[in-house]
């Protein structure tokens, strides 16, 4: 931004955005609350230079996805739908089964539902990295640990 006082609305440019890396431990975190905070950081709404049509967000690494908490009876009742695009290709999977097979998909599905469903949303979603265990290969980026608001 310029050093003089200006009363014009600031609009971020893609080249000016500085990106940080955050790591979030999902162990015993409620899925919806975690996904909402992750989506906010991915969009960049926590920054003062947030611009709705520009990717101003940061990278987020979520670890321990297999130890996420679902409130209420969602562990047994929640179902995930997918379709193979062939007749009779509908597939329904319970949350408890998906948490055992692919725990990353549960968090990715929740976060994707909170991002815009357009080109910008797809670009934002690529900055989300989810891992089932406590280890991740992004130590070189020096991610800062972030706590989830309860």
UniProtKB/Swiss-Prot annotation:
A GO cellular-component term linked to this record: cytosolic large ribosomal subunit
UniProt keyword Membrane present: no
Name the record gives this protein: Large ribosomal subunit protein uL13
Domain of life assignment: Bacteria
Listed InterPro entries: Ribosomal_uL13 (IPR005822), Ribosomal_uL13_bac-type (IPR005823), Ribosomal_uL13_sf (IPR036899)
Organism taxonomic ancestry: Bacteria, Pseudomonadati, Chlorobiota, Chlorobiia, Chlorobiales
Species, as recorded: Chlorobaculum parvum (strain DSM 263 / NCIMB 8327) (Chlorobium vibrioforme subsp. thiosulfatophilum)
Transmembrane segments annotated in the record for this chain: none
GO process terms (BP): negative regulation of translation; translation
Gene3D superfamilies tied to this protein: Ribosomal protein L13
Subunit record text: Part of the 50S ribosomal subunit.
UniProt keyword Ribosomal protein present: yes
Alphabetic keyword roster: Ribonucleoprotein, Ribosomal protein
């Amino acid at each position: 931004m310029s050093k003089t006082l200006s009363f014009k609305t600031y609009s971020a440019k893609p080249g000016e955005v500085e990106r940080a890396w955050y790591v979030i431990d999902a162990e015993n975190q409620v899925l919806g609350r975690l996904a909402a905070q992750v989506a906010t950081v991915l969009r960049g709404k926590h920054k003062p230079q947030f611009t709705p049509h520009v990717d101003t967000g940061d990278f987020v690494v979520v670890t321990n996805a297999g130890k996420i908490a679902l409130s209420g009876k969602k562990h047994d009742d929640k179902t995930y739908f997918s379709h193979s695009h062939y007749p009779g290709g509908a597939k329904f999977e319970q949350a408890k089964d998906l948490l055992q097979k692919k725990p990353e998909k549960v968090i990715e599905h929740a976060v994707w539902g909170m991002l815009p469903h357009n080109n910008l949303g797809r670009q934002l979603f690529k900055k989300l990295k989810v891992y089932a265990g406590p280890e991740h290969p992004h130590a070189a980026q020096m991610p800062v640990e972030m706590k989830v608001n309860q």
